[in-house]
Amino acid sequence: MEGMLNELNFKFKSENPVDVVLPKHHYGVVGSGDLEVLLKKHELEGAVEIRVVSPVRGFDHVWEKVLEKVISDAEVGNVAIEINDNNATPVVVALRLAQALSEAKSAEQSVN
């Protein structure tokens, strides 16, 4: 099935989740070795749902560990996240997602 994108779905819950402030947020761009993160505030009983679309196959466990760590560190909840990946390394994934969540949690950000 060459040419088809891989779709992964995860659900995480932090111990003390904090809702994001922004109702919607877009961060990054799908470019070579990078990714975009789309966040949408959504009632999930404190959980975080993440959908990853990537051309890379066979690294589901790596995605799960990286995403779980970032969500745990960010202590967010009630947000649906979509990640559109273009061969980003785990370090780039963690950085971009952490940046997006930090901005979405910040009350100083303006809503577009």
UniProtKB/Swiss-Prot annotation:
Protein name: Malonate decarboxylase acyl carrier protein
Chief location bin: cytoplasm
Source species of the chain: Malonomonas rubra
Localization of this protein: Cytoplasm
Family named by the database record: Belongs to the MdcC family.
Post-translational modification: Covalently binds the prosthetic group of malonate decarboxylase.
Alphabetized UniProt keyword annotations: Cytoplasm, Phosphoprotein
Higher taxonomy: Bacteria, Pseudomonadati, Thermodesulfobacteriota, Desulfuromonadia, Desulfuromonadales
One GO CC term, this protein: cytoplasm
Function: Subunit of malonate decarboxylase, it is an acyl carrier protein to which acetyl and malonyl thioester residues are bound via a 2'-(5''-phosphoribosyl)-3'-dephospho-CoA prosthetic group and turn over during the catalytic mechanism.
Modification type O-(phosphoribosyl dephospho-coenzyme A)serine: residues: 32
